Amino acid sequence: MEIFHISAECYPMAKVGGLADVVGALPKYQKNAGNDVRVVVPAYDTKFKKENNFECVHWGTVKLGNFNFPFSVLKESSDKLGYELYLIEIKELFNRPNVYGYEDDIERFLSFQIAVLDWIIARNKVPDIINCHDHHTGLIPFLLQFAYKYENLKDVKTVITIHNGLYQGWFGFDKLYYLPEFDLKHIGFLEWNNCINSLAVGVKCANAVTTVSPSYLNEINYSANGLESLFNSVRNKSKGILNGIDIEIWNPLKDQMIAANYSIENFEIGKQKNKEKLCEQFELDPSKPLFSFIGRLFEEKGGDLLPQASALALSEHFEEINILILGSGNAEIESQLTQLRNDYKGNYNVFIGYNEELAHLIYAGSDYILMPSRVEPCGLNQMYAMRYGTIPIVRRTGGLRDTVIDFGDDGNGICHDQASVGDICYSINRAVKLYDDKISFNTVLRRGMAADHSWERVCQEYIEIYNLIIQQK
């Protein structure tokens, strides 16, 4: 079947979070399974775009109300990604370094969605499936069904995959005229709390709804930033599918970004070499257990808990542990974490920002990864960590609940229930004791490394959903 994935992010073209990793991996495995797969994202001004070759396969003009924006469809020439990657180039709106955070984001992603559909209908070939990802593409199922200009695409089956339901793409009805013409009797599909809610539109109109873990599907039925009743009403067309990870990229045996390669058979030597390299870089002691955090420094990820939790844990275990933070986000949290460097030099360090190569080294060189998330629809970091023999310390929520079992229950990690400084510190205390028991520590570590988080299983679950909705009239 022919499958289109439409997304705001796709690794390695543009990455802000886990959305990019999923959209960069799932299509590759779907193509390996014999499908014709295309990924479409905006043409941001990124390093990948500058360093790779593209050919223009279509051009046109997006009409956004009274505004007209020329656009081009650029195809990545090498096909080295394992699927066909297309960029929608609207220079006035997307020739910028960042993915999000602009005042005209509504206009940017509306124009992107319209340009995608304008191109698809111009191909004179109707795809079997369009899989939309998050609110940035949530209007596509509505436009396919009801916009006059896309009449010939109305039978295309659509799936919307929710990677994070907190972000919903709200905008007012004063911008309704941006949309291609449709019969106003269908306007109710757009409305949610007297506004247009892009995510809600997608959930209402798509043939199927998926979330990125089974537990997250359950959680959004009682906590979804105002959409709880909607998610309850569409349970019959919804499924939670736990994400996989790209085990070709995330492979400690072949990873070129780490100091020494290793496998489950010889992890002790390999991890120690990576730990020494990492600790040398950040002036830490490689003989102590290393607790690391990789992620965005926001409340959603528990980032606001890290300064106090780090300070308390270091005060209690100053001679026993190291803590390393890699992340960016809230300026106040960044400042607090940076200030700790002076108080706990030699046991603590922080890198404000994000660096992919450094992230790989941290997964390889750390003993524990901290994930105190308040919300974690799936979470990929815990899977990356386990793949590299680093034990996750997590709060039980979303995909963390589905992937990490406490070592007290013969599991692969350390779990707590509350998003609190106290629970984080208690888990660190347990981790220190576990680290001192090398036999038990290595047993937990091996369980994580042995887990199967590959995309083959995930790919098949998506294909089953596609086949099911294609059969529906």
Curated annotation (Swiss-Prot):
What is known about what this protein does? Synthesizes alpha-1,4-glucan chains using ADP-glucose.
Q: Which reaction is recorded as catalysed by this protein? A: [(1->4)-alpha-D-glucosyl](n) + ADP-alpha-D-glucose = [(1->4)-alpha-D-glucosyl](n+1) + ADP + H(+)
At the top level, the lineage of the source is Bacteria
> What is the scientific name of the source organism?
Flavobacterium johnsoniae (strain ATCC 17061 / DSM 2064 / JCM 8514 / BCRC 14874 / CCUG 350202 / NBRC 14942 / NCIMB 11054 / UW101)
Pathway, per record: Glycan biosynthesis; glycogen biosynthesis
Question: What is a single molecular function from GO for this protein?
Answer: alpha-1,4-glucan glucosyltransferase (ADP-glucose donor) activity
Q: What is this protein called?
A: Glycogen synthase
Key word Ribonucleoprotein present in the record?
no
> InterPro entries per the record?
Glyco_trans_1 (IPR001296), GS/SS (IPR011835), Starch_synth_cat_dom (IPR013534)
Q: Which UniProt keywords apply?
A: Glycogen biosynthesis, Glycosyltransferase, Transferase
Where does this protein hold ADP-alpha-D-glucose?
Answer: K15
Top-level class of the enzyme under EC nomenclature: transferase
A GO biological process of this protein is: glycogen biosynthetic process
Q: Which family does it belong to?
A: Belongs to the glycosyltransferase 1 family. Bacterial/plant glycogen synthase subfamily.
Q: What is its EC number?
A: 2.4.1.21
